[in-house]
UniProtKB/Swiss-Prot annotation:
Gene3D superfamilies: Aspartate Aminotransferase, domain 1, Type I PLP-dependent aspartate aminotransferase-like (Major domain)
Major place of residence: cytoplasm
Catalytic activity: (6R)-5,10-methylene-5,6,7,8-tetrahydrofolate + glycine + H2O = (6S)-5,6,7,8-tetrahydrofolate + L-serine
UniProt GO molecular function: glycine hydroxymethyltransferase activity; pyridoxal phosphate binding
Subcellular location: Cytoplasm
Entry keyword set: Amino-acid biosynthesis, Cytoplasm, One-carbon metabolism, Pyridoxal phosphate, Transferase
Residues the UniProt record annotates as site (Plays an important role in substrate specificity): H228
Chloroplast among keywords: no
Source organism phylogeny: Bacteria, Pseudomonadati, Pseudomonadota, Gammaproteobacteria, Pseudomonadales
The keyword RNA-binding is annotated on this UniProt entry: no
Protein name: Serine hydroxymethyltransferase 2
Residues that coordinate or bind (6S)-5,6,7,8-tetrahydrofolate: L121, G125, H126, L127, S354, P355, F356
Length: 417
């Protein structure tokens, strides 16, 4: 028998110390990684619940194990809320991650060797959209499109490549693109060549849910997303689609038993909470602020003479090119880290440096907005970053910024009393 008094602190001091240090880091550091956010205590409570004990292969009402009557309720809540949130007819909440959701889509609708057309990783796409190092680039004939000299997707190029290569699937989505995707144009191109249109909205799902970014569900054959990032839920994946019995059956079979075994019902419960939170009016205000904050930060960098890829942002993120400053993303990342500002180095279009070094930084505002930053704080923060980038080796500047960061983090904590 387990005692409910047996806590991590009492049982595993080493692990607990690392967890406490991470909690302190999250409170004292400013988080600007575009794919990161903070979940609510309710989401974390679900992930630490007794639901972690239950195995439930299959789907609600069609399980391979007994004792699933209550996890069926949990999973159906998540399904129904996801469908309501995104206006979808179909939702699969079982994918363990966004990459696994994407792999399931490929497994469902493609055969090995089929041609896919996706955004180049070097131009802002994602590994799972056909990058050569990913299974999506190894199992399928991956053709890549990119951005033009203005930092915008060249839809004429997308259409030309589609006509030339006749892909079975066109992938629309990104990990580092700051503008609005033209889903009707993608749909028209896909229809022209008889391809599936698959949209990976992992980065903007929260914005879509709040109505501040176009919803791809009406245009795509299938849509995937993560449930963290802007959606602010647990780490996990989600597949959505319009009503299509054939595609729905293929997707369900691809997730289970095709790509996964038993679902993580404790994570699915956390997804259900996340979707409920995203259905509230305050979530829309949050997402509107996320975009305002990103635009405020990008504006400061432009004023200070830095190059923002695509000239600005219409979502939660933007890329800063440091080619002109002859600074590597790796060095900039390290210097900002000393000041308790967490970012990630990122390749930029036509980057002369390797992906391990890069010439850019990616910034995102979901996490700082969660802790209460508005435009004023974000402009101030961008100014501090510019001060450091102007002289990476100036320890006095780094020390001064770190103290400012600690002060504003204390003023705007992630988790209040």
């Amino acid at each position: 028998m387990f005692s409910r008094d047996l806590t991590i602190a009492k049982y595993d001091a080493d692990l607990f110390a690392a967890m406490e240090q991470e909690a302190q880091r999250q409170e004292e550091h400013i988080e600007l990684i575009a794919s990161e956010n903070y979940t609510s205590p309710a989401v974390m409570e679900a992930q630490g619940s007794v639901l972690t004990n239950k195995y439930a292969e299959g789907y609600p009402g069609k399980r391979y194990y007994g004792g699933c009557e209550y996890v069926d309720v949990v999973e159906q809540l998540a399904i129904d809320r996801a469908k309501e949130l995104f206006g979808a007819d179909y939702a699969n909440v079982q994918p363990h991650a966004g990459s696994q959701a994407n792999a399931a889509v490929y497994l469902a609708l493609l055969s090995a060797g089929d041609t896919i057309l996706g955004m180049s990783l070097a131009h802002g796409g994602h590994l799972t959209h056909g990058a050569s190092v990913s299974s999506s680039g190894k199992l399928y004939n991956a053709i890549q499109y990119g951005i033009d000299a203005n930092g915008l997707i060249d839809y004429d190029e997308v259409e030309r490549l589609a006509v030339e290569h006749k892909p079975k699937m066109i992938v629309a989505g990104f990990s580092a693109y700051s503008q609005i995707l033209d889903f009707p144009r993608f749909r028209a191109i896909a229809d022209k060549v008889g391809a599936y249109l698959f949209v990976d909205m992992a980065h903007v799902a929260g914005l879509v849910a709040a109505g501040v970014y176009p919803n791809p569900v009406p245009f795509a054959d299938v849509v995937t997303t993560t449930t963290h990032k802007t959606l602010r839920g647990p780490r996990g994946g989600l597949i959505l689609a319009k009503a299509n019995a054939d595609i729905e059956k293929k997707l369900n079979s691809a997730v289970f038993p095709g790509a996964q075994g038993g679902p993580l019902e404790h994570v699915i419960a956390a997804k259900a909470i996340c979707f409920k939170e995203a259905l509230q009016p305050e979530f829309k205000a949050y997402q509107q602020q996320v975009v305002k904050n990103a635009q405020a930060m990008a504006g400061v960098f432009i004023e200070r003479g830095f190059d923002v890829v695509s000239g600005g942002t219409e979502n939660h993120l933007f890329l800063l090119s440091l080619i002109k400053q002859e600074i590597s993303g790796k060095d900039a990342d390290a210097a900002l880290g000393k000041a308790f500002i967490t970012v990630n180095k990122n390749s930029v279009p036509n980057d002369p440096r390797s992906p391990f070094v890069t010439s850019g930084l990616r910034f995102g505002t979901p996490a700082v907005t969660t802790r209460g930053f508005k435009e004023a704080e974000c402009k101030e923060l961008a100014g501090w970053i510019c001060d450091i980038l102007a002289d990476l080796n100036n320890e006095a500047v780094i020390d001064a910024v770190r103290e400012k960061v600690k002060a504003i983090c204390k003023k705007l904590p992630v988790y209040g009393a």
